[in-house]
């Protein structure tokens, strides 16, 4: 079947001779070069994913020259080669050769996610999840309702604080965050029209990422609950990525971008959006005044606020100082105060500098995608191998997952 697909792809682009009357008289020296449709398609997908030839070769497990020769039409990939290449690009062979909605590479905010340029494996994982999400919605005939609001502004350069606050407040009011709580941030984003799921990642620099494919808005969050690490960072990352989707649609492009242009500003604006979204001004000021938190030392006041808003200590510090409820402290002095209260000597990570961390199990990682896959499996609409493909796990792991679905856990039985 793959050989047939290759023949179809090669036939997509035929050479046309300008002078129809001299079709049989064309000189050999001026004959058009052989078409290279498959190589062009590989190159197009690679460039759209912002991969270098070397990066793609590394993911496929071949030499750089092999990929170069494929793209130049000097050699032709066989069926097995295409399986590995399409997998490395995060698409199916059919998508690679014939196009369609699923073949359109997702658009990442590369300027806002600099580590993506170095770790292309993450973008491939994201693309596979996007394709799986689109497929399971089609199988279940269940499309995510609601469309994420965007806010247009004519201003050039940095966004005004008032504009960022307005956007965050508007979305917060329609999100149900107040009732659901930030621990259920995945459900909150899905309620706003953003497909959300969790991924596992051992590297540094990526806590979450946002991407767009067609009309689909998508956020992937690092599964810190499974790692037993600070989930406050996951919550803030989710709101931060929402900020990029809402405030910076121009970042999500497949075109070449300036490496560092305005990246710090965009990150600062997304951080400001996240702070306003998670800790709204009116509610923060009300609690601060009603509970007379100004009477406390800053450390104790922030601990009390954390019991209200369930976000990170440092997010609350930024909000309190932004709103001039307390004066800003020199970072070194503030960190030393935290260390003193926590009994920490020597260097410390940001996770270690978080007083009273939320328990990892408090984060709800169940999401719409996993529920749809489970529902399809229980209805025998998909098999174990498809579950493995969609979850990007081994077949043996998928068997364990589907077995657990059939035999749910029960609570303790009283004697």
Predicted features along the sequence, with ranges:
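Active-site hotspot residues in diverse enzymes, especially metal/ion-binding acidic/histidine motifs
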Residues: 2-415
């Amino acid at each position: 079947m793959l050989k047939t697909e290759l023949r179809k792809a090669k036939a997509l682009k035929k050479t046309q001779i300008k002078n129809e009357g001299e079709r049989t008289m064309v000189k050999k020296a001026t004959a058009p070069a052989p078409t290279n449709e498959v190589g062009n398609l590989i190159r197009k997908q690679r460039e759209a994913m912002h991969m270098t030839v070397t990066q793609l070769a590394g993911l496929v497990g071949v030499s750089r020259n092999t990929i170069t020769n494929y793209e130049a039409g000097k050699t032709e990939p066989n069926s097995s080669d295409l399986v590995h290449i399409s997998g490395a690009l995060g698409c199916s062979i059919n998508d690679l050769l014939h196009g369609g909605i699923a073949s359109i590479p997702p658009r990442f905010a590369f300027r806002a996610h600099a580590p993506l340029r170095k770790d292309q494996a993450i973008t491939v994982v994201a693309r596979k999840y996007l394709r799986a999400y689109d497929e399971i919605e089609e199988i279940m005939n269940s499309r995510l309702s609601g469309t994420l609001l965007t806010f247009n502004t004519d201003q050039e350069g940095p966004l005004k604080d008032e504009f960022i606050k307005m956007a965050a407040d508007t979305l917060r009011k329609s999100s149900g965050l107040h009732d659901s709580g930030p621990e259920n941030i995945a459900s909150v984003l899905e309620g706003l029209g953003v497909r959300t799921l969790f991924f596992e990642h051992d590297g540094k620099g990526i806590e979450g990422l946002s991407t767009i494919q067609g009309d689909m808005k998508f956020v992937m969050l690092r599964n810190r609950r499974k790692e037993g690490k600070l989930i406050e960072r996951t919550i803030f990352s989710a709101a931060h990525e929402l900020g990029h989707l809402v405030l910076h649609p121009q970042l999500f492009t497949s075109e070449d971008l300036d490496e560092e242009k305005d990246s710090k500003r965009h990150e600062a604006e997304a951080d400001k959006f996240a702070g306003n979204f998670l800790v709204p001004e009116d509610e923060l000021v009300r609690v601060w005044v009603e509970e007379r938190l100004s009477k406390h030392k800053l450390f104790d006041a922030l601990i009390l606020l954390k019991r209200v808003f369930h976000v990170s200590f440092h997010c609350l510090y930024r909000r309190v100082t932004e709103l001039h409820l307390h004066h800003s402290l020199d970072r070194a002095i503030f960190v030393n105060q935290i260390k003193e209260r926590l009994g920490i000597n020597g260097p410390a990570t940001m996770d270690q500098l978080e007083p009273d961390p939320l328990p990892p199990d408090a984060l709800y990682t169940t999401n719409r995608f996993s529920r749809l896959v489970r529902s399809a499996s229980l209805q025998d609409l998909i098999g174990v191998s498809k579950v493995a493909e969609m979850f990007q796990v081994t077949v043996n792991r998928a068997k364990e997952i589907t077995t657990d679905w059939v035999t749910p856990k029960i609570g303790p039985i009283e004697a």
